[in-house]
Regions:
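Conserved short submotifs of the Hanks-type protein kinase catalytic core
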Residues: 34-48
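Activation segment signature within eukaryotic-like protein kinase domains
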Residues: 68-69
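Conserved catalytic-loop aspartate of Hanks-type protein kinases
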Residues: 147
Length: 202
């Protein structure tokens, strides 16, 4: 384990030790040997949200998307109340309690999370480019609100089945995230409620 890996794992442990919250994975135990630190986390046999969506052809009901979005938002609100920016929100870090449609979701993988005081800002790079806020991509200072941008990206994916700014070229993703609006003219937009349209466009 490199020093960087150890630092990320220690950061994750400190954050996981803080809370017990329904939509955040629980840390059950910690043990180590001479070379490895082990975390025992609760079992979530449904896999991650990306696989859940992929198994359904990235096509789920709006009502199901609403439940997932609300669960993610309440988890982020809880983290932010403790001054913690999650900083790596993406479907691969959202675990499912089962493979069924009514599965509960829990945030996992807090290695990139960071405590940011109310009047503090950070310019530390992080995360996955398709889900990161423009200020992060530009190397500018940011606060905990960058998680809300990532929530918007995940919400867009849940209702549309696609990412709002997606390309094999990372430079183009950056350019589109900064300069372009997502596609609101595709057929999927006509299939969701007025409230859903309003939320996604925010």
């Amino acid at each position: 384990m490199t020093n960087k890996d150890l630092e990320l794992q220690k950061r994750e442990i400190e954050i996981l030790k803080i809370w017990q919250f329904p939509n955040i994975i629980r840390l059950l135990d910690i043990f180590e040997n001479d070379t490895t630190l082990f975390l025992v986390l609760e079992l979530l046999p449904g896999g991650d949200m990306f696989d859940f969506l992929q198994d359904r052809g990235f096509n789920i009901r709006e009502s199901q998307a609403q439940v997932f979005i609300k669960s993610i938002a309440t988890a982020l609100e809880y983290l932010h109340s403790y001054g913690i920016a999650y900083r790596d929100l993406k479907p691969e870090n959202i675990l499912m309690s089962s493979k069924e449609d009514d599965a509960e979701i829990k945030l996992s993988d807090f290695g990139l999370s960071k405590i940011i005081a109310p009047n503090e800002r950070s310019d530390e790079p992080f995360g996955t480019i398709s889900y990161a806020a423009p200020e992060v991509l530009l190397g500018e200072e940011y606060d905990k609100s960058v998680d809300l941008w990532s929530l918007g990206v995940v919400a867009y994916l849940l209702v549309s089945g696609t990412l709002p700014f997606d390309d094999d070229n990372e430079d183009l993703i950056l350019e589109r995230a900064i300069n372009d609006d997502p596609d609101y003219k595709s057929p999927w937009i006509s299939k969701i409620s007025k409230e859903g349209k309003h939320f996604i466009k925010r």
